[in-house]
Curated annotation (Swiss-Prot):
Keywords: Cytoplasm, Ribonucleoprotein, Ribosomal protein, RNA-binding, rRNA-binding, tRNA processing. Belongs to the eukaryotic ribosomal protein eL8 family. GO terms for cellular component: cytoplasm; ribonucleoprotein complex; ribosome. The gene is rpl7ae. This is Large ribosomal subunit protein eL8. GO terms for biological process: ribosome biogenesis; translation; tRNA 5'-leader removal. It comes from Pyrobaculum neutrophilum (strain DSM 2338 / JCM 9278 / NBRC 100436 / V24Sta) (Thermoproteus neutrophilus).
Amino acid sequence: MAVTIDPKTFYANPPPGKPFYVRFEVPADVAEKALEVLSVAKQTGKIKKGTNEATKAVERGLAKLVLIAEDVDPPEVVAHLPLLCEEKKVPYVYVPSKEKLGKAAGINVSAAAAVVIEPGQAAGELEALVSKVNEIRAKNGLNAIPLPGRK
């Protein structure tokens, strides 16, 4: 059964001072943990970098976690990712800076989005991170999204 989400209501209430595609506020410590998980997964697992790669990974069912930068300009570049992640039931988290996201992904330029495909040695940290993100989502009235392959 396909999930249908109305984009008008989906993007209705971003946190104050955040772009319209941000659905919940991520504390700085959780965002840093997400960048750390991405960095470890880059070294010991598998990641994808960039919005196009992230979109393909989610659509193909490969993504374990999607990281989306909050400072993307224009915001329409990544605006589809939260909606796509919700539809495909893939956990996602926002990080404050595309520069930090690019650095954590191991590239010398900024990245609007990145995806953990295989967490490698960050598997336990990834589970804890997704659990924490789901707690944040619950506080904002959003449903939990478990790790793919988990209930």
